[in-house]
Amino acid sequence: MELNDLISKTGQWLKGTGDHGDIVMSSRIRLARNLSKKPFPNKARKKDLQDILAIVQAAVKDILFFKKTILLKMTELDNVDKQFLIERHLMSHEHANNPEGKALVVSEEEVLSLMINEEDHLRLQVMESGLNLNETWKIASAIDDALSGKLDFAYSISWGYLTACPRIPARRCEDPS
C-alpha cells in the first residue's frame, strides 16, 4: 500500500455507515504511550528519536493489526501529503512540524493511525464510522495490548501511563472539549 492508495478512496470512518451515521460522523479513541527508559520526544535528541522510531517500527511489523498498513516517514513527505493526512484526521499539525525521527502508520481503511514521536512516543488513534464507541474502544484496547506485549511502556502505579502532557489522562479516555 502507498499514500496514493489512501488518496484515491474514502476512509471507513467518513462513509457514514455506522450507528446513527446520519447524525454522528465518527467515533474516535486515542491513547498516548511512551517507552520506559527513553526521553520523551520534547527532551529527546535526534539520535534518540531515530532509535525510538526503529524500536516501534520493529514492534509493529509483527503485530496482526499492522499487517495492512503503510509507514510514512515525515522526512519523506511533502507539504501537500502532510496536509492531506491532517485533513483526514490521521495526524496532527504538530506531527507535521520538525519531521526528523517522526513517522505515521496508517491502516488501509484509515481505522487505525499511529503517530510515532509526536508529543509522546506513540499516539494511537482508532476511528469508526457513526456512534460506535464500544467497538472503537475494543479495537484500540486490543492494539494497545498487542503493542504492550512488544514494547515496555512508561507506567507508574500512582499515575498510570506516563504522558508528556498533563492534560491527557493516563488511565481514562480523553475529553476533547
Where is each model-derived feature located?
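Conserved phosphate/anionic-ligand binding catalytic regions in large, soluble enzymes, centered on
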Residues: 160-175
